[in-house]
């Protein structure tokens, strides 16, 4: 089964409940909502309330215990993991970087990411300035785990990597926490302007 080409990343949760394998307690019970393209859906709640668990169900890091999740009307269990995850740009709470250049990090996970998309993604993620300030620019080597860049720079590169995939759905799991106020505001403004046709899901603490 594949996604309908003409559709644009609408997500629907239908009576979704979830508990971890072997657990008695449900973390999520009877969740119903729709997230549409061109809209931002925010998940706000205290630590441990299940926000991250909920969004981790969309790329199928876990499967629902009951109910179903649809993307463009198709149950995500009927679609290959490859096709599902190609449709999603996901930024986890702690964005991981790998040893290699900034370019190889930004193009990781996307099969055919062009230089144009890479540069645009870095611009939206407010990463262009600090990348340009480095002598080798996008060819700058990153240490394993990103130990030679700051927390805010690491987060911006993780955001740029997700954006470079040019997906229809973008999920940000508390992904702006290491950014200063000014950078955060600029990044949110750029995301709203540049990704106005995408489906955005944002977890906030």
Residue spans of the language-model regions?
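ABC-type nucleotide-binding domain
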Residues: 4-205
């Amino acid at each position: 089964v594949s996604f309908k080409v003409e559709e644009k990343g609408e997500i629907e949760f239908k009576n979704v409940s979830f508990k971890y394998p072997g657990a008695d307690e449900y973390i999520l019970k009877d969740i119903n909502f729709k997230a549409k393209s061109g809209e931002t859906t925010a998940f706000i709640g205290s630590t441990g309330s299940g926000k991250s668990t909920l969004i981790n169900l969309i790329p199928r890091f876990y499967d629902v215990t009951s109910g179903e999740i649809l993307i463009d009307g198709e149950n995500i269990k009927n679609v290959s993991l490859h096709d599902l995850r190609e449709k999603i740009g996901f930024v986890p709470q702690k964005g991981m970087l790998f040893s290699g250049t900034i370019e190889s990090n930004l193009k990781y996970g996307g099969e055919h990411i062009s230089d144009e998309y890479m540069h645009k993604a870095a611009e939206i993620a407010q990463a262009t300035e600090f990348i340009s300030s480095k002598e080798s620019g996008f060819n700058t080597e990153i240490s394993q785990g990103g130990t030679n860049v700051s927390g805010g720079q690491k987060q911006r590169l993780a955001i740029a990597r997700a954006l470079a995939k040019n997906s229809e759905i973008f999920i940000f799991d508390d992904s702006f926490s290491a950014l200063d106020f000014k950078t955060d505001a600029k990044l949110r403004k750029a995301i709203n302007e540049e990704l106005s046709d995408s489906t955005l899901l944002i977890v906030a603490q």
